[in-house]
From Swiss-Prot:
Natural source organism: Homo sapiens
Name recorded for this polypeptide: Putative melanoma-associated antigen 5P
GO biological process, one term: regulation of chromosome segregation
Annotated keywords: Tumor antigen
Region span, Disordered: 1-69, 82-103
InterPro entries: MAGE_N (IPR021072)
Length: 124
């Protein structure tokens, strides 16, 4: 086999690697979408409230090691989040009758992330 034939023989494999990487990214994106759908379907939301209803067996309000309540931090975060929501609502055109499902999901996800960060800050 000549050098030229070897180099041509290697080129299709490079194309396969690129295709596999592209398919891998698509697979990751599909898995992420499926996970987001699973989270949104498993998180019970109560219309008209800012947060979620805790699932049965979930821990109650977070406490610091000294026993003090985490309410001041939660209030600060809630006020900050409301100010952000207020500014984004001013940008919307016209009233909407029902909340966008994506925005509901994002709000629930933001709350969970904030709770996790708060918990980790208290723990470590």
């Amino acid at each position: 086999m000549s050098l030229e034939q070897k180099s041509q023989h290697c080129k299709p494999e490079e194309g396969l690697d690129t295709q596999e990487e592209a398919l891998g990214l698509v697979g990751v994106q599909a898995a992420t979408t499926e996970e987001q759908e699973a989270v949104s379907s498993s998180s019970p939301l109560v219309p008209g409230t800012l947060g979620e209803v805790p699932a049965a067996g979930s821990p109650g309000p977070l406490k610091s090691p000294q026993g003090a309540s985490a309410i001041p931090t939660a209030i600060d975060f809630t006020l900050w989040r409301q100010s952000i929501k207020g500014s984004s609502n001013q940008e919307e055109e016209g009233p909407s009758t029902s909340p966008d499902p994506e925005s509901v999901f994002r709000a629930a996800l933001s709350k969970k992330v904030a709770d996790l960060i708060h918990f980790l800050l208290l723990k470590y």
